[in-house]
Swiss-Prot record:
Entry keyword annotation includes Metal-binding: yes
Function: Metallothioneins have a high content of cysteine residues that bind various heavy metals.
Family as reported in the entry's similarity comment: Belongs to the metallothionein superfamily. Type 15 family.
Protein name: Metallothionein-like protein 1
Residue ranges the record marks as coiled coil: none
Molecular function terms, GO-annotated: metal ion binding
Short name of any one Pfam family annotated for the protein: Metallothio_2
Alphabetical keyword list: Metal-binding, Metal-thiolate cluster
Length: 80
């Protein structure tokens, strides 16, 4: 398999592919934290949760993508 800068190419469904689409492929788009005043409003209502059968796998790949390990095998889908 091909790796790009130590990052494997992660395809759909959290499966590694041969491309260079690994985590942090575009460093200029990486997460940065801005310092700003924030207000947190706490409520007493229970959190709203919705579970759709079969949607968990796609949501993990869509929201986080894959984190590829050094041996070009996908680790848990938790790259953000």
């Amino acid at each position: 398999m091909s790796c790009c800068g130590g990052n494997c190419g992660c395809g759909a469904g959290c499966k590694c592919s041969g491309g260079c689409g690994g985590c942090k492929m575009y460093p200029e788009l990486s997460y940065t934290e801005n310092t700003a005043a924030e207000t947190l409003i706490l409520g007493v209502a229970p959190p709203k949760t919705t579970y759709l059968e079969g949607a968990g796998e796609e949501a993990a790949a869509e929201n986080g993508g894959c984190k590829c390990g050094p041996d070009c095998k996908c680790n848990p889908c938790n790259c953000k």
